[in-house]
Design a protein with these regions (language model features):
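Short, cationic low-complexity segments
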Residues: 122-144
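Extended polysaccharide-engagement surfaces of secreted carbohydrate-active enzymes
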Residues: 127, 153, 169
């Protein structure tokens, strides 16, 4: 029996939680959950076999268990997930942008709500409200949060199609007919990726755009990382190239004949650009040298 002398519970070790809770739970979910095709339309947004496999791949990658991470990435791929033809197809409030072929786990939102931040019936997304250029009138709300830095913007390679679909900068394509000016933010930039125009969300609490928590591009980059860390650097080119090709970076020579260290840097760069502002960066940096990578 447990002693009652010390009433303060002690903290379990990290590895105990991983090995006895997180991994068994996700393994069981992978074995028992339906695939996305087995769900009805009414069940869209529920966790699937693919979601469990993708999350388990992240866990194994974090622990440096690369063979098992690769196994789970392959499991996701075998379930039929694919990249959307266009990067911007992954984001937006239109029905065509929701639960796409690339989406593995997606938080569902509903724009018809009367409640504010604290309302229990509030089912709208707030990303567009928070990230729209401050006081621009381009989106409902527009607080101007999460402004990209110059250092981040400089990471885009010439010809990368994702730049114009991720950030607003002076000279970028207009947003709903509106020209962006550098004076609209402190850094000269705002996030574009999650913005929903007034025509689709007229107020700050009416945004129906979903949020993709896990998508296939992430899995492909995890697969590339696992292969490279296993010493299979040439094989890592394949999933990496798939992601870069959609972004318009079609010169295969840019990622060929690299050392393991060079490929590692390429993959890390690609994750930063492909998954920008989607909530993965902090976890990636912790995984890479306990945050020293930053």
């Amino acid at each position: 029996k447990e002693s009652l002398t010390n009433k303060t519970p002690f903290r379990q070790s990290k590895m105990k939680i991983y090995n006895e809770v997180i991994i068994p739970d996700l393994r069981e979910a992978f074995n028992l959950l339906p695939t996305r095709e087995q769900y009805s339309n009414a069940d869209k947004g529920r966790a699937t076999k693919g979601a469990a496999a993708g999350m388990l791949a992240k866990v194994y990658l974090t622990l440096g268990r690369y063979s098992e991470a690769l196994e789970m990435c392959n499991a996701v791929e075998n379930l039929g997930y694919t990249l959307n033809p266009d990067y911007s197809d992954c984001f937006g409030a239109a029905e065509r942008n929701k639960n796409t072929a690339e989406s593995i786990f997606e938080i569902q939102y509903y724009g018809l709500t009367k409640d504010d931040f604290w309302g229990e019936e509030n089912q709208a997304s707030w990303l567009s409200t928070f990230m729209g250029p401050r006081n621009s009138g381009w989106v409902g709300g527009a607080y101007g949060w999460n402004q990209p830095t110059q250092e981040f913007v400089d990471q885009y390679e010439a010809g990368d199609l994702r730049k114009d679909k991720t950030i607003l900068y002076e000279g970028c394509p207009n947003f709903e007919g509106n020209a962006y000016r550098a004076s609209m933010s402190n850094t000269g930039y705002n996030v574009r990726k999650f913005l929903v125009p007034l025509s689709q969300s007229p107020d700050f609490n009416t945004n129906p755009a979903n949020f993709v928590a896990l998508r296939f591009a992430d899995v492909l980059l995890m697969k590339a990382e696992a292969l490279n860390e296993l010493g299979r650097t040439t094989e890592a080119e394949v999933p990496l190239y798939k992601v870069r090709t959609r972004a318009g970076l079609t010169n295969r020579a840019d990622i060929e004949n690299l050392t393991q260290t060079q490929m590692r840097e390429k993959i890390r760069h690609e994750r930063r650009i492909e998954l920008a502002f989607e909530g993965h960066r902090w976890f990636d940096m912790i995984r890479w040298d306990n945050g020293q990578y930053a």
